[in-house]
Structures are given as C-alpha cells and as structure tokens.
Amino acid sequence: MSKIQATINNYFGTSFRRKLLDKFQQDHIQEYRGVVLDIGGRDRGSFKKPKAVVDRWIFADIEAKHHPDIVLDVAHMDVISTESIDVVNCIELFEHVQEIDKGITECYRVLKNGGTIIISIPFLFPIHADPSDYQRWTNHKWDNILHSVGFKSINIKPMGGFFTTLSDMVSMFINELPLILRLSRFILIPILSLLVRLDNTKLVKNNNTLNKFPQGYFIIANK
C-alpha cells in the first residue's frame, strides 16, 4: 500500500478517537525511554512506536495468539521484577482488565522510582470485547486511584468532546448502512472532520453542558 493510499484510508476509515489517540501519543513520544513495558500493545493506528530509540521494548499480552514477548495479566505480573521498568505503556488496556485496581498497583510496583505510566482509556465510546470490556471511569476516579497507589505528577487530559463523540457515532451509523448509502461517508467525513474542531474552541470548553462529553482520557503519571 502506498503512502497516499494509507493516508486516504486513515482519513476516511479510521475513527476520530483513534486519530486523536495517535496524535496524543505522538505529542508525548519523548516520554518513551529506557525499558518500556507495553501491555496489550498490539500495533494499531498510524502512530509509530519508538522501539528503536529505547533500551528495550517489551510487548506483553494476556493472549499468546498475539505473539507477545511475555504472556501475562497486568493484575498478576510476577514475572516482572520490582522497580525494573522505566515506562509502562497501557494504551486502551484498562477497560479490559477485571481486577483493575490490582493492575494499577502492579504497574506501580514494576516501575523504577521516577518511572512513568502512560494510559489511554475510553469513556464515551462503544463497548468492545478484547476479550471482555468491564468499565468506564471518569477523570475523578482515575485521579483518586492513581494517587492512592502512590503516583505523582498526574496529568489527565480529556480526549475529544461533544462533537467528536457525535461525529464518531454518525460515522459508525454510516458503516451500518447498505453499501450504496455508505458511500455518503466520502461527503460526510470531511464535514465531520471540521465539526470535531469545535471541541477545541471556547464555545465547548467554557460550556458547562458541552464540555462534559469526553470520548476518553490520556493520562501520564510518575512514580
């Protein structure tokens, strides 16, 4: 596939949430360093993980069929030594973790002092089994649990908002239409792409109704 084809496919075929997630990861690419434990980190989206510039990139997954370096459950990481990891990468992971409190505690344990955890998590986004989907937490819940475990310098950023959530819902609806009607996405996606920009305006950010519709959160915290 050519670069132009990939760009077109990404523009018309990728959810607005995934595009946001790729951007957030790229904007914080400097956080990846040393030994990185990438839990559930199957390669998705257009973000290129900086595997070549870190000391070691360890791909861990609960399912062996994805060919991880280590098969493990984030809530039970006995195979990972205490304070041996510089960065724990948890992208779109914790909604699928049943024992989420234990998982966060384990991440804290394996991190070195000064180490970093990077989390992305959906909120107003469809239930999706991988293999199961257990929860959606608000920013207040995330702040409380991360503080209680011992994390510091917690930075929680909302991903998307009212118009991003609405646009993804419209896009998903289009995908369920008969083929001939699905062609309308070539007209609607450019319009929706403009619409999502409203989430970055004062119209939304300062509105006490419209600013309460995050699609998810991107979180960085330190041990």
Model-identified regions with their sequence ranges:
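Surface-exposed loop/turn positions
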Residues: 84, 114-115
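Redox-cofactor binding/interface segments in oxidoreductases and associated redox assembly factors
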Residues: 38, 90, 119
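A short beta-strand submotif of the Rossmann-like class I SAM-dependent methyltransferase core
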Residues: 87-93
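Conserved N-terminal segment of class I S-adenosyl-L-methionine
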Residues: 1-83, 87, 212-217
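Short conserved AdoMet
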Residues: 52, 98, 112
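S-adenosyl-L-methionine-dependent methyltransferase catalytic module, highlighting the catalytic core
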Residues: 98-102, 106, 116-222
